[in-house]
Amino acid sequence: MSNVLVLKSSISGNNSQTNQLVDYAVEKLQGNNIIVRDLSQQPLPYFDTVAAIAVRGEPKTIEEKQLLALSDELIEELKNAQTLIIGAPMYNLNIPTQLKSYFDFIARPSVTFQYTAKGPEGLLKGKKVIVLCAFGGLYDEENLVTQYMKSILGFIGITDVQFVYAQGIGFGPEAIEKAQASAKNKINEIVAAL
């Protein structure tokens, strides 16, 4: 049995094409220890100056200490997971702010990455990630969602990342059905190889 961390970030709930893919992947991974964190239904605090001080400095106030405890909890979940399922829909060419906040809280110097003479080095190695993306249009792999997810995951040491796309969902019901079927087939292939 494997530990699986699932991150949902779509604001569209059950109507979300990305969430439908995430739910499908979770169903295929039953029998594992699965933790689901819905960043839209249970949003993290906005990563502001207080949060930055809390996770990168010396927390002094009660609020700073609470934010550090939250960061520690998120990082512990991440460290314990062998596999991550991340729902990353495209909103205005980028990931949802809820997902960006998550990465702001878990990207911590000397905890999930360290600075070296050769540049930053990620400390969370050996994890597998499946990123599930629904796009209204058709995009190549140079899109900002894919590039950001590769970059931020690599920054913390995670390089075994596979992407599953449901593209063209903005073209109507037939396109949605086709995109979902194609994405689910890809999920089946990836899960079978885990």
Curated annotation (Swiss-Prot):
Please list every transmembrane segment annotated in the UniProt record, as residue ranges: none
What Gene3D superfamilies is this protein classified in? Answer: 3.40.50.360
Listed cofactors: FMN
Q: Origin, by domain of life?
A: Bacteria
A GO molecular-function annotation:
oxidoreductase activity, acting on NAD(P)H as acceptor
Q: How is the cofactor bound?
A: Binds 1 FMN per subunit.
What does it catalyze? 2 a quinone + NADH + H(+) = 2 a 1,4-benzosemiquinone + NAD(+); N,N-dimethyl-1,4-phenylenediamine + anthranilate + 2 NAD(+) = 2-(4-dimethylaminophenyl)diazenylbenzoate + 2 NADH + 2 H(+)
Residues recorded as binding FMN, renumbered to this chain, are: 10, 90-93
EC category name: oxidoreductase
EC no. given is: 1.6.5.-, 1.7.1.17
**InterPro entries documented for this protein:** Flavodoxin_fold, Flavoprotein-like_sf, FMN-dep_NADH:Q_OxRdtase_AzoR1, NADH:quinone_OxRdtase_FMN_depd
Keywords on record: Flavoprotein, FMN, NAD, Oxidoreductase
PANTHER family in alphabetical order: FMN-DEPENDENT NADH-AZOREDUCTASE 1, FMN-DEPENDENT NADH:QUINONE OXIDOREDUCTASE
Q: How does it assemble?
A: Homodimer.
Task: Name the protein family.
Answer: Belongs to the azoreductase type 1 family.
**Record's function text:** Quinone reductase that provides resistance to thiol-specific stress caused by electrophilic quinones. Also exhibits azoreductase activity. Catalyzes the reductive cleavage of the azo bond in aromatic azo compounds to the corresponding amines.
What's this protein's name? FMN-dependent NADH:quinone oxidoreductase
Organism of origin: Haemophilus influenzae (strain PittGG)
This protein's encoding gene: azoR
